[in-house]
């Protein structure tokens, strides 16, 4: 099963690279333009999707102007089952999105593999209403196999400016075995992390080729990195308060 899982993950990644290449390039261009014009990159996901927002935040080798939006009741540590139930509530997103500093010069990623629950959909709609370019990473196969739980009847991919398909299967579990009664082993996290890091890698090069120094974190475990990082954090701390611990 170890080799089988590696094979299946590689198949998903190859599908993304083959079929989503132009969307990945477009996302990278939009990200690079936003940062050069003073914007930031904001991300939101519920449950396990929020892991992707943390993967790229305050990351060695990653972009500095990254702002994840955390609403702890929708994360797992305050009650995993409860978080799943809350994600299904229409208009709940307004409780934490109304006062978020989202601007027209920003890019906003919404991450949801099923794409059917109200909270991610409302988050995407709010980001768009505030003028941010909104990119969704989702599974079209999964989304199209299930009815929307949003009051509009729409799925997440239907409300985005740009959609990137992560090619997760329905239910996200990619493996099966004759001795196991249900499918198992998800792919959305490893593929989603790869998608985001690939987009940001391309965006970094686009900025550099345009004569703009990309704001990149060095690992804090390298001597001299703190001075480098603190100078860039100073530039973005007001827009990304959680970089320095402000709520």
UniProtKB/Swiss-Prot annotation:
GO terms for biological process: carbohydrate derivative metabolic process. It comes from the Bacteria. It holds the Pfam family SIS_2. Transmembrane segments: none annotated. One of its GO terms (molecular function) is carbohydrate derivative binding. Residues 31-214 form the SIS domain. PANTHER family: PHOSPHOHEPTOSE ISOMERASE (PTHR30390:SF7), SEDOHEPTULOSE 7-PHOSPHATE ISOMERASE / DNAA INITIATOR-ASSOCIATING FACTOR FOR REPLICATION INITIATION (PTHR30390). Belongs to the UPF0309 family. NCBIfam families: PRK02947.1. This is UPF0309 protein GWCH70_1414. It comes from Geobacillus sp. (strain WCH70).
